[in-house]
């Protein structure tokens, strides 16, 4: 029990540390990802104004669920939404997740659309 509490505490600290580093680069909007076992979510957040500029989720599309194919499709959708907002660069917030699997597929798909991190 104590081991899982320590692990959860370390993950939370890691996320907060990454978020504080990203908020220093406040000139760019933050592209934040969240993954559950069943779905994948992403938001484009303007930390200065504290508003969400765009969002996508596999829950809304309902095609694939939370697998790598869904993450790639959502990445293409988010890349198009970012370009529609006339933004070229964003700060990518992995939210403490490893850059692997669904997170990597999402990021690569956003980059395919021409958005720079």
Swiss-Prot record:
One of its GO terms (cellular component) is cytosolic large ribosomal subunit. Residues 1-23 are annotated as: Disordered. Keywords: Ribonucleoprotein, Ribosomal protein, RNA-binding, rRNA-binding. Residues 1-17 have a biased composition (Basic residues). SUPFAM superfamilies: Translational machinery components. It holds the Pfam family Ribosomal_L18p. CDD domains: Ribosomal_L18_L5e. One of its GO terms (biological process) is translation. GO terms for molecular function: 5S rRNA binding; structural constituent of ribosome. Belongs to the universal ribosomal protein uL18 family. This is one of the proteins that bind and probably mediate the attachment of the 5S RNA into the large ribosomal subunit, where it forms part of the central protuberance. NCBIfam families: L18_bact. Part of the 50S ribosomal subunit; part of the 5S rRNA/L5/L18/L25 subcomplex. Contacts the 5S and 23S rRNAs. This is Large ribosomal subunit protein uL18. The gene is rplR.
